[in-house]
Amino acid sequence: MSKQVFEMIFAGKKLVVETGQVAKQANGSVVVRYGDSTVLTAAVMSKKMSTGDFFPLQVNYEEKMYAAGKFPGGFNKREGRPSTDATLTARLIDRPIRPMFAEGFRNEVQVINTVLSFDENASAPMAAMFGSSLALSISDIPFNGPIAGVQVAYVDGNFIINPTAQEQEASALELTVAGTKEAINMVESGAKELSEEIMLEALLKGHEAVCELIAFQEEIVTAIGKEKAEVELLQVDPELQAEIIATHNIALQAAVQVEEKKAREAATEAVKEVVIGEYEARYAEHEEYDRIMRDVAEILEQMEHAEVRRLITEDKVRPDGRRVDEIRPLDAVIDFLPQVHGSGLFTRGQTQALSVLTLAPMGEAQIIDGLTPEYKKRFMHHYNFPQYSVGETGRYGAAGRREIGHGALGERALEQVLPSLEEFPYAIRLVAEVLESNGSSSQASICAGTLALMAGGVPIKAPVAGIAMGLISDGTNYTVLTDIQGLEDHFGDMDFKVAGTREGITALQMDIKIEGITPQILEEALAQAKKARFEILDVLHGAIAEPRPQLAPTAPKIDMIKIDVDKIKVVIGKGGETIDKIIAETGVKIDIDEEGNVSIFSSDQAAIDRTKDIIASLVREAKVGEVYHAKVVRIEKFGAFVNLFDKTDALVHISEIAWTRTANVADVLEIGEEVDVKVIKIDDKGRVDASMKALLPRPPKADNPKKES
């Protein structure tokens, strides 16, 4: 196929799609140019079905540093493992695409997005999401798309689609919404305590823009799309299915209705073992033994899936006996750990998270060096999910995509209420350790994080709580669930996480397993989540009503002063001479950023105060109208030079010494004498003029008697 080009204007920027020129051996490939961002997307599919019990979809988002004209860091000077941002973007693309493949699809699919050129004002992640959907749609891979995604900002009461970096900086909302032309199927958001009404409007505005992109994709697919390949879907033997349902469904239904998680798991596992043992014995010598046993396992999974959904939609009964809008028992504890800078333990039913706070000087902030300009990240929220939290053995090692994603969600939820750097000059790290899990552990980590911050004396603006909402839908009727547990998450249609304060929402995340949900469901889920959030906030308030007025004794003492940017070199000195001298004299640690924020760290408050005084004197400038207690340092015929402070001198002209005429400066002033002066002028060369007489009472004018005529 020869090169073909398609164009449209979207959100004020040119969107160009090129096909048929590069990566032609992939099942589908496109080059997407949006503004000056360029992304190559290639989609490939294995020829045979995999043997696993899940759909092996892999989505990658590869940031090439040359795209921003930068060298990679490190010794080898080449790209290594994906950055956190790249991992989160890959998840962002995966989530709306995954539901668009047929049930039982087991061929491996890889979608590789490579950022070739980066423009921070034209979203490369959204270009990659568009390219991923389009590459799959024009290929022969059986993909039930297209989908598309956009970013939405909220500035001065207006919604902006795919904002520039400057617009996003000013925005109260950072939202990514994706979906089909019929409905939304993925949401990721951070917000500055926005109302449910504004969030819902933002979602709908975003979906309108999504529909524009989908219409453009449909035009391209009509023009160049390939015929879809015939692939084998994982389907069970219907006769075997009917037989197992007839003989074992009642026993499995009873097991599913056991309320306590561990007891329920044991009961369902016992039923499954009986069924599997029966069929292993019957078909041990059968030539299709592996296929039959795979079908048996799949049928049992489908039966459990069907019973959980039936209970909720028909009987309005949840597996643990709760009402559809009922939260599991809650508990909140602070100061769980000694020595640390703050800690909180939050429990919701059989889900439990321990959050631990660590404070440090800004020199410990994380340096982010990606495609965007390098910056320091002050707040970090890390999430760990050990396998013992669900009573299982498993892999231990570096954080995976899921842990990185859950940590980022908690980070977005909590960073909206953190004090500014000027108010609280610390780098802040929260680590959430999931100790037990039966669903919604990411939201438990947010609640535990709030407890740890407040217990540690971080002056947050308001406590934040999170809740996970679920959905069971049969296409006609639906039920929205509050505080979903693991079974409801696994067999349900939606995982909709909402975090916020009493004033509004600070984070949203939604993933669904069906093709989309309606505005009505979104509105209902947000309303139920608000009610639940307030209930959880009451429990957090019971544990700690407000942030402690002081830090933990083990926390470092840090103070910060702001200096003019052009004074940074004065504090540092030639070759660091000045700052090294200050550190040697006071014993503190000092960190200065490029904006003039000076952080001073020590265990001794007196040393911090002494350092602040030294730096203040170094950067001090004379100001017109201010009064100084000065010392005479030089006398000339035309006036006296006085030292105001440090290396700043001023001239007191002979006419500014007194209101009466001064014949000789040396008659009224001597070197070393201390006098009060007022600055009256600073010229464009920085020379300072001061006055002594301006501080003295002006003598009355002498009366001039009138002459008699």
From Swiss-Prot:
Binding site for Mg(2+): D489, D495
Any one Gene Ontology BP term: mRNA catabolic process
The protein's required cofactors: Mg(2+)
Positions in coiled-coil regions: none
Catalytic reaction equation(s): RNA(n+1) + phosphate = RNA(n) + a ribonucleoside 5'-diphosphate
Protein family (similarity comment): Belongs to the polyribonucleotide nucleotidyltransferase family.
Name of the protein in its database record: Polyribonucleotide nucleotidyltransferase
Species the sequence originates in: Streptococcus agalactiae serotype III (strain NEM316)
